[in-house]
């Protein structure tokens, strides 16, 4: 009998969270949870979606987003806590939301045609789910 370590259990929980979040909308291309160093804790790509990033590009993107998130947190005393960040690109829209602790970040990509209101609605649902899960 093989016992699971707490790390294995946490990884499985993160994978389940990603799948649950991916199921919120057919316009979500990818959901990932990354740590404060940009390392992927779990991620799920919508079925049939071709990734736009190469593996190395994804690693770099997640590192950049984790770094940006860390830097933004230094201003929370002045401007308040981060609710989410939104980046509109030619091919996708990227949404990031801080996790329940400073050590995680939720990373979403959306199909290009997704409206701001749709993304905002999903962001509100995700914020509630993050609170409920912790």
Q: Locations of the language-model features?
A:
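Non-catalytic interaction/Regulatory regions outside core domains
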Residues: 1-134
């Amino acid at each position: 009998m093989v016992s699971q370590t707490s790390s294995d259990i946490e990884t499985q929980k993160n994978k389940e969270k990603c799948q649950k979040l991916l199921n919120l909308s057919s316009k979500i291309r990818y959901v990932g949870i990354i740590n404060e160093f940009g390392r992927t804790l779990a991620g799920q790509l919508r079925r049939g979606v071709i990734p736009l990033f190469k593996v190395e590009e994804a690693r770099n993107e997640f590192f950049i987003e984790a770094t940006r998130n860390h830097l933004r947190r230094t201003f929370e005393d002045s401007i308040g806590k981060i609710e989410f960040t939104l980046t509109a690109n030619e091919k996708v829209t990227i949404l990031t939301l801080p996790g329940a602790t400073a050590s995680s970040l939720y990373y979403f990509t959306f199909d290009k045609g997704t409206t701001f209101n749709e993304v905002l609605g999903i962001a509100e649902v995700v914020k509630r789910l993050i609170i409920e899960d912790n």
